[in-house]
Amino acid sequence: MARRPPHPRGARLLLFLLPSIAISSLLLLLFHHHHHLPYLLRPLWDSPPLPFTRLPHFYAENVSLPLLCHLHGWSLRPSPRRIFDAILFSNELDLLEVRYRSLLPFVHRFLLLESNSTFTSLTKPLFFLLNTHRFDFAKDKLLYARFAPFTNPQSPQPPFRMESILRSAVNSLIRQSGIADGDIIIMADADEIPSPNTLQLLQWCDGIPPVLHLELRHYMYSFEFPVDFSSWRATANVYRPGVLYRHSRRSNVILADAGWHCSFCFRRIEEFVFKMVAYSHADRVRRKSFLDHERIQGIICEGGDLFDMLPEEYSFTELIRKMVPIPRSASAVHLPRYLIENADKFRFLLPGGCLRTAE
């Protein structure tokens, strides 16, 4: 018996339902993942900034300073410059210890400003002030100041505006520091650590650019997860009247491989939670579950993204390449010397130490 052809009305209904289901599913997907769209489509609507001119960085142990200066196209000074290190501090106590121990022989004055308010206008403890005993080794070189910005709980400042207010406050500390024309001032965050050999070049070589960005090896969660060389905001500035503290692009020249930038490199899970709600991108905490300690611990050991975000890239090639977790590295070579000398104390910053304490 011949099979009856499908009913024309049923076929038309099917043709209508299939696209409707597909469109509805797409809209539902976009609704739940709309925060990904700007990042997914960024290569279409945004252009990368002007590339830096990268200065090659020459260094090897026991190579003389005259030769190192010469290799960079600079000349040896008769005496070393003074170096000032200026940072706005939040809660990175362990990295600050690594920073100050590593840079102590080269820095004339450490300038540290601490606020009782986060970028998101939350009241915060003065973590440094509560832990000054950890930094007694640097107290003779330290100029510390507290800053209490005016905050209205009913109308808090936007996070990036508050960040700008706090960074501008560092300028008063610079003016009190005794800095003079021709000195070098490092402007960076606490987790952006120039290498000692970089500071040695800045101390002893004449001819360096007046504003030199520092290309830092970027790590996430610890030195077990190297990301790339994308960190550029730290700068070395030849001081002149009118030089102001900034954490943004100031020139087109960058010194290659000039140190380390370890983002979210904390000992305790609670420190991760604090930063997630305290820094300028706190709006990325879209759900309370993002702050769950077990979730954070899992992401740290996977090399994933705490905010479930797509990478901020300008090409689809880089976007796709960075959509996977950060590959682990077993190398602890070319890291800060103090870190290696105190590996037991800072095990959480080294390969194999991803498990954190919960308290």
Where are these regions (language model features)?
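Juxtamembrane luminal stem/stalk of type II transmembrane Golgi/ER carbohydrate-processing enzymes
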Residues: 1-86, 91-92, 106, 305-308, ...
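Active-site-proximal specificity loops/subdomain of glycosyltransferases
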Residues: 50-83, 116-188, 195-200, 323-339, ...
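Short, well-formed alpha-helical segments that are part of the catalytic scaffolds
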Residues: 92-105, 109, 119-130
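Eukaryotic short linear interaction motifs
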Residues: 93-95, 118-121, 152-153, 193-195, ...
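Short loop/turn motifs at secondary-structure junctions
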Residues: 106, 180-181, 208
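Conserved beta-strand scaffold positions in the cores of enzyme catalytic domains, especially
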Residues: 110, 142-146, 211-213
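Short internal beta-strands
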Residues: 111-115
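Conserved catalytic core of nucleotide-sugar-dependent glycosyltransferases
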Residues: 192-308
